[in-house]
A protein has these predicted regions:
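Bacterial N-terminal signal peptides that target proteins for export
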Residues: 1-9
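Sec/Tat signal peptide C-region and signal peptidase I cleavage site
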Residues: 18-23
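N-terminal leader/targeting and pre-domain segments
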Residues: 24-58, 156, 161-165, 169
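Thiol-based oxidoreductase modules, predominantly thioredoxin-like and allied folds used
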Residues: 42-45, 87-107
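Short active-site neighborhood of thiol/selenol oxidoreductases, capturing the structured segment around
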Residues: 58-69
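Typically the conserved alpha-helix immediately C-terminal to a functionally engaged Cys/Sec
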Residues: 75-90
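Non-catalytic, surface beta->alpha helical segment in thiol-disulfide oxidoreductase systems
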Residues: 118-172
Length: 175
């Protein structure tokens, strides 16, 4: 009888302790604070300099995510990434994430004026590791219905990664 209780418990533990969950924990523990949270008190200019330096060191692009703790879609996006470890890993393996808070407390006006207009929240920008802006992206484009799409996310992350900068920059010149 005791064996029947141990089998479901063992199966549950095996599911929870997958290599992907370990990888997510390892990635999360190594992320700088500006990649983890929206904070009204952070200086986005200093964080951007640090993000660009890290991107140069690791040959990644910078993904700037504009939002805030008040933003329900920002929370949905974080939940989506937590539930999809392959997307989470692709994001952090290919990009340095810079979360910039905009709120009633701190609109970060000076920083926001340096970027193309925000179309909604969360809003994302991709820059090279030298700071050249390549893309302004409404995250609604990553939705299928009312949910973020795993396929749309993986396609987006693949298309704008560091290894494709030369082609993306060339395409920008011809548009």
């Amino acid at each position: 009888m005791k064996t029947t209780y141990y089998i479901p418990l063992l199966m549950s533990l095996l599911i929870l302790l997958t290599p992907q969950s370990f990888a997510m924990d390892n990635i999360a523990s190594e992320l700088p604070l500006y990649s983890k949270i929206y904070d009204d008190e952070r200086d986005p200019f200093k964080d951007a300099v640090a993000a660009i330096a890290l991107a140069q060191k690791t040959q990644r692009n910078v993904l700037i995510e504009i939002g805030g703790n008040w933003c329900s879609w920002c929370h949905k996006m974080d939940a989506f990434l937590a539930k999809n470890p392959d997307v989470y890993q692709a994001l952090h393996n290919k990009y340095v994430l810079l979360k910039v808070s905009v709120s009633d407390v701190n609109e970060n006006e000076a920083f926001m004026k340096s970027l193309p207009p925000v179309l909604g929240y969360p809003h994302m920008y991709v820059s090279t590791n030298s700071g050249k802006m390549m893309l302004s992206k409404d995250t609604a484009e990553l939705l299928e219905g009312d949910y973020y799409s795993k396929n749309a996310w993986l396609t987006f992350l693949d298309q704008w990664q560091y290894d494709k900068n030369a082609q993306n920059l060339l395409n920008m010149k011809t548009e």
